[in-house]
Regions:
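Alpha-helical, hydrophobic structural elements that either
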Residues: 1-288, 311-349
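Ligand-binding pocket scaffold of soluble enzyme catalytic domains
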Residues: 293, 304-306
Length: 349
């Protein structure tokens, strides 16, 4: 989001142009800029004030800028809680679960899905990008220039924080249509919320937990636990040696769930080792700037529905990867996919 640079440096402000295939940082020289369509719409949604100042009609589609406003005090409260400063603004200082919680609480971050209804036809996004302006940055850090240019162009109040999301919507017809009516629907993308931790030792062990939204009391019962390995050749790398050992837990849920519930490993797993030349031999050395999320962990796919048993659907959760077989019981974390806000529709034209 932010740059650490000489605060006295002031780059020249370029002419404001928006391109369908471009972003805030550049575009193809072959592409023509879109024609601005003033909208000047404001609304409240998901705990934020939103402004849609303009859209841009391009040869390939429609581009819309979404401006989400956040009060300064909300940002300061968030930064104080997580002790965020110039020396601590990196994911390497936080566990995967803490990173998920930070993303959930970040007042300058909201993952949403916009849909347009143009002349009665639905338009979906093909791609997008965003910039963030934070008025509470500590000394030594400044907002990136592109965020400042966007605020200046749209005359947005710099005493607030802003997330400006640019979404591109391809035309649904071969020709650029005349805009007769235009509406927007905002839908929150489900977010992953970490829940209680647990450990299991053997088949037959069980763990009960409540869904944080529905309040349903679920019981997880272990059916199988086994050690497995991934062949090193599956990673397809001659430069890195990857951990290959992991634990698979197969389990059932009662009652059977129609809600999105997953299980992941609380452990980050072992880091890959880079094969570095030492003398005449290749010696693996651990590197801190690489990570593995192929199997388990909060960022990886962790649950697979594997079939039916007499007890109900059978699921499988995979642990993080390690260089040695996992001897201790894995500490698992429940994970819920949740929407906190209902969708809303706004007439733009």
């Amino acid at each position: 989001y932010y740059d650490v640079v000489d605060q006295n440096a002031k780059p020249a402000i370029p002419e404001w142009k928006v391109y369908f295939e471009g972003n805030f940082w550049g575009h193809s020289e072959k592409e023509r800029a879109g024609t601005e369509v003033p909208l000047n719409q404001q609304f409240e949604w998901a705990g934020h004030h939103w402004i849609i100042p303009a859209a841009y009609s391009c040869s390939k589609g429609f581009v819309v800028d979404f401006c989400m406003r956040t009060p300064e005090e909300d940002i300061r409260r968030f930064m104080t809680k997580w002790d965020l400063h110039s020396e601590n603004d990196s994911c390497e200082y936080f566990t995967q679960e803490q990173q998920l919680q930070i993303d959930l609480e970040n007042p300058l971050c909201l993952d949403f899905i916009p849909r347009l209804e143009l002349n009665g036809k639905t338009m979906l996004t093909s791609h997008g990008c965003s910039v963030v302006f934070n008025p509470c940055l500590p000394d030594g850090m400044i907002n990136e220039a592109e965020a400042k240019w966007a605020l200046e162009h749209y005359d947005l109040d710099t005493s607030y924080g802003w997330m400006i999301f640019r979404a591109a919507f391809p035309w649904t017809s071969k020709r650029r249509p005349e805009i007769k009516s235009l509406s927007l629907t905002m839908e929150q993308r489900p977010c992953r919320v970490p829940g209680p931790h647990f450990q299991t030792h053997a088949p037959g062990d069980s763990f009960s937990f409540l869904h944080p939204v529905s309040g349903t009391n679920y019981t997880l019962t272990v059916q199988e636990i086994e050690q497995q390995t991934i062949p090193q050749k599956c990673f397809g790398s001659d430069r890195w040696v990857y951990p290959t050992h992991f634990t698979v837990m197969r389990y059932t849920l009662f009652p059977e769930s129609e809600e999105d519930i997953s299980i992941c490993d609380c452990c980050d797993g072992d880091k890959p080792m880079e094969i570095a030349v030492e003398g005449d031999s290749f010696t693996p050395e651990t590197q801190n700037n690489a990570c593995v999320g192929i199997i388990g962990g909060a960022d990886g796919p962790t649950v697979i529905m594997t079939g039916e048993k007499s007890q109900g659907r059978l699921y499988a959760a995979c642990s993080a990867l390690h260089f040695e077989p996992v001897r201790d019981d894995v500490e698992w974390c429940t994970m819920f996919s949740i929407k906190n806000f209902d969708e809303t529709t706004i007439n733009l034209i």
